[in-house]
């Protein structure tokens, strides 16, 4: 279950209903998908082959199709980041630059953890700490950035409005 941390106050929201209500109030789509169908060989596997990535997409194809139909998404892929990722520190520096997109930024966490820091409607930033099974859609034009949690590893399905993917606007 995702958790929220409000930067300015350093307060946390950890209750499932309160997290869902908070995100809904910020126009952030949040869903919990069933991660238990992930087979053992893909759990906590951060060195994925193309076949592994295709298997992950197949496992969650119904959920991807459902959210895509509801929200107009057109493309998707799987990304894996860990300490074995070449230039991970450089990638994280780039990810941590505050930006926005002209379309939604959607991620479903398969393994590991990630954090989206999002500027709320009141101008204050909050973190959405994500774990396996969490799907988030950061709304278009919302200022945000992404980083990893202390374990520095994540496998995520990225879902896009266009086949070109997101274009960051700094």
UniProtKB/Swiss-Prot annotation:
Signal peptide: none annotated. The record marks 98 as: May play a role in metal incorporation in vivo. One of its GO terms (biological process) is L-methionine salvage from methylthioadenosine. Its EC number is 1.13.11.54, 1.13.11.53. The record marks 104 as: May play a role in transmitting local conformational changes. Its cofactor is Fe(2+); Ni(2+). Pfam families: ARD. GO terms for molecular function: acireductone dioxygenase (Ni2+-requiring) activity; acireductone dioxygenase [iron(II)-requiring] activity; iron ion binding; nickel cation binding. InterPro entries: ARD, ARD_bac, RmlC-like_jellyroll, RmlC_Cupin_sf. CDD domains: cupin_ARD (cd02232). Binds 1 Fe(2+) cation per monomer. Pathway: Amino-acid biosynthesis; L-methionine biosynthesis via salvage pathway; L-methionine from S-methyl-5-thio-alpha-D-ribose 1-phosphate: step 5/6. The keyword Lipid biosynthesis does not apply. Belongs to the acireductone dioxygenase (ARD) family. HAMAP family: Salvage_MtnD (MF_01682). Monomer. This is Acireductone dioxygenase. It comes from Bacillus mycoides (strain KBAB4) (Bacillus weihenstephanensis). The lineage of its organism: Bacteria, Bacillati, Bacillota, Bacilli, Bacillales. The gene is mtnD.
